[in-house]
Amino acid sequence: MTASENQKVAVITGGSRGIGKAVAEALVAQGIRVVIGDILDDDGHQTAQELNRQCAGDSQMVAYIHTDVTLYKDVIALFRFAEATFGGVDIAFLNAGIISGADNVFLPLEDEVEVNLPKVNITGVVKCTKVAVLHMAKRGGGVIVNTASVAGFLSSMQLAHYFATKHAVVGWTRSMEMLKDICNVRVNAVCPHWVATDMQGMILNKEGDDPYKQLVEHSPRVKMETVVRGVMMLIEDEKRNAETLLTLPGDVIRVQERIAEYEELSTPEYAALVDSYQPQVLEHYKKQLEHALDRYGL
């Protein structure tokens, strides 16, 4: 089944439950078709069936495909499946993430302890972005929203590894600002505080007598609807690009501004060089995009 040309299509990673599922529900409510990619196959199929049952008059608004975001073959299959099923991809909500192994400073000195968290939380976002951009560029543009976190601006010994991955997602998101001028693709990040999701449960179920659990148990929560509203703002407002949007307790949503540039890093001569460099690099990347599309087969 292929959607009509004016029908918007969204891809959601980690969409089987939690924030991803809530955003899928919001998108479907607006008539946007959704493809969920996840490794939780039972939950994924159940979520797709549940949302399809809610769509009166249209039996397939949501489809599911098994997706490991750390593998290019799975990510490519996800976006090609979305294109084959619904006609293209306009929106990508890159939400897949894990928190296990986050308190890693004194864990055993074993390689796998440090591998999985950044592999999913950072590399997964990078791989999905690269594939999403190609499909969106073919379609004339689109928008990507990454799930970062308030943790991307803070520090915590107890969850140091997790916090580091979310700092990386913030940096990656802001670094994609030029994509809008290259191929009309906007990239933003939603940065929630603690939500009552499965990931938070994983913290509370940590082994041992960790006093950090008490802090998490009593920490203020952000409502799921606040997070969803933030994601929808980033999708719908075409002026929002390379933006990091905090969603906080008390139904507060606000942009986390960047720090000011360090004046010591520039001179008048260097600033003039940067001004002349911008149009050159834009053309350079447009040519790289053409080569990437040819290489990918779009």
Name what the model sees in each region:
Residues 189, 209-263, 273, 279-296:
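C-terminal helical subdomain
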